Amino acid sequence: MINILVSNDDGVQAEGIRCLTEALSAFATVLTVAPDRNCSGASNSLTLTNPLRINNLDNGFVAVNGTPSDCVHLAIRELCEQEPDIVVSGINAGANMGDDTLYSGTVAAAMEGRFLGLPAIAVSLAGKELLHYQTAAYFSAKIVQGLLAHPLAKDQILNVNVPDLPIEAIKGIKVTRLGARHKAEGMVKTQDPAGREIFWLGPVGKEQDAGEGTDFDAISQGYVSITPLTVDLTAYNQLAGLEHWIKIL
């Protein structure tokens, strides 16, 4: 039997993780371990100064008082009876495209699985109303089965974004590169009830690089976007130039 570890960053009670677990359970044994609260934007953060605690829920899910990366690390090292065949993170409530991937706890949970030597994918539902989690769950299951039958290189994860459309309205699947956004808009300054100044992060930047071949473009056309992401962040095409640069310092 196939063993799958599922996690997310929206929290253990999120609709997306419930739909994902249900879809994958049709052909695999699934362990779902996720944060006990919403951890959107947690990126690859780990909890280093406090202990992690687990709470076994009535539906079989495991809630952890930690980050998405904590959840995957803890599950693989301590909670899984057998090592998972694959880690699946999602289904995120909202897209993770372009620059979003650097901040995403959804992507980070998948990356943590890859750090520990396992195939991994991150899945997000791209849209505003977020009505069609079942569509994302359907394509998640399809992609997972494909990965298990035909594994990819070990230094990558797949970042999957699914349009918020009925299954029959999806035009297909496109392999894409990450697009990019303009810089984020300014902070929102306001006051708390006591009159003290507080700040909220402003809206994300508008799409800057959203042309043909990008994840933004695929989603806008009604296609599922699959972007391979590498764990190695080295800019190899800059190494020679940097070698020259340090000689003239």
UniProtKB/Swiss-Prot annotation:
One of its GO terms (molecular function) is 5'-nucleotidase activity. Its cofactor is a divalent metal cation. It comes from the Bacteria. InterPro entries: SurE (IPR030048), SurE-like_Pase/nucleotidase (IPR002828), SurE-like_sf (IPR036523). A divalent metal cation binds at D9, D10, S40, N92. Gene3D superfamilies: Survival protein SurE-like phosphatase/nucleotidase. SUPFAM superfamilies: SurE-like. It catalyses: a ribonucleoside 5'-phosphate + H2O = a ribonucleoside + phosphate. This is 5'-nucleotidase SurE. It is found in: Cytoplasm. Nucleotidase that shows phosphatase activity on nucleoside 5'-monophosphates. Keywords: Cytoplasm, Hydrolase, Metal-binding, Nucleotide-binding. Its main location: cytoplasm.
